[in-house]
Amino acid sequence: MAARLLWAVRRRMQPLAAHAASEGRGWLHPFSTATQRTAGEDCNSEDPPDELGPSLAERALKLKAVKLEKEVQDLTVRYQRAVADSENIRRRTQRCVEDAKIFGIQSFCKDLVEVADILEKTTECISEETEPADQKLTLEKIFRGLSLLEAKLKSVFAKHGLEKMTPIGDKYDPHEHELICHVPAGVGVQPGTVAFVRQDGYKLHGRTIRLAQVEVAVESQRRL
């Protein structure tokens, strides 16, 4: 009797056990889904660094842009200063050139003042009220004054590199001589040479600044 009762209980429990087993498998599915979700979230947890990547790169570019902008501003300031300095140098140079043009002959003029003083003293010797007896003395003073004036003038010219050209007997040179006419070659005068100087020429430090006006000797008797 007890054995039959135990068999009946087991038989009734089998469907419940089967149902419980099927339910148990269903219960496992949610846990597996949650596990999958958790794993997926864990896998996706590495995505944020990828999302932060562009942000860091953008930051670096902005910093670089700011740095370049500062460099551009610095270079602009330097350029403006260089332009200003160049303009100042140009103005100073121009002023120096203008001063050189104006005051370049200052030393020469200072020496000429002494010549003017001698000339003034010489002319003071001449007076309308000079007595006939004093004319000889006056002429002597004038002669001495003019001689002193000539000597002083030559000294001033030599000091400043001004040289007088008196090319009598020199071969005609169109770079130094201005031909006025031809004259017959006389005794001791070679054709093609300067026979007579009408006006002296001048050189300044070896450079001709005024041609000498000359007459050149030729073999022909014809005067041009």
Swiss-Prot record:
Cellular localization per UniProt: Mitochondrion matrix
Annotated coiled-coil segments of the chain: none
Broad class of where this protein is predominantly found: mitochondrion
N6-acetyllysine modifications at: K141
GO biological process, one term: protein folding
One Gene Ontology cellular component annotation held by this UniProt entry: PAM complex, Tim23 associated import motor
Gene Ontology terms for molecular function: adenyl-nucleotide exchange factor activity; protein homodimerization activity; protein-folding chaperone binding; unfolded protein binding
Entry keyword Mitochondrion: yes
Keyword Cytoplasm on entry: no
PROSITE patterns the record matches: GRPE
CDD domains reported in the protein's UniProt record: GrpE
Quaternary context: Probable component of the PAM complex at least composed of a mitochondrial HSP70 protein, GRPEL1 or GRPEL2, TIMM44, TIMM16/PAM16 and TIMM14/DNAJC19.
PANTHER family: GRPE PROTEIN, GRPE PROTEIN HOMOLOG 2, MITOCHONDRIAL
Protein family per UniProt: Belongs to the GrpE family.
General function of this protein: Essential component of the PAM complex, a complex required for the translocation of transit peptide-containing proteins from the inner membrane into the mitochondrial matrix in an ATP-dependent manner. Seems to control the nucleotide-dependent binding of mitochondrial HSP70 to substrate proteins. Stimulates ATPase activity of mt-HSP70. May also serve to modulate the interconversion of oligomeric (inactive) and monomeric (active) forms of mt-HSP70.
Entry protein name: GrpE protein homolog 2, mitochondrial
Lineage: Eukaryota, Metazoa, Chordata, Craniata, Vertebrata
Primary gene name: GRPEL2
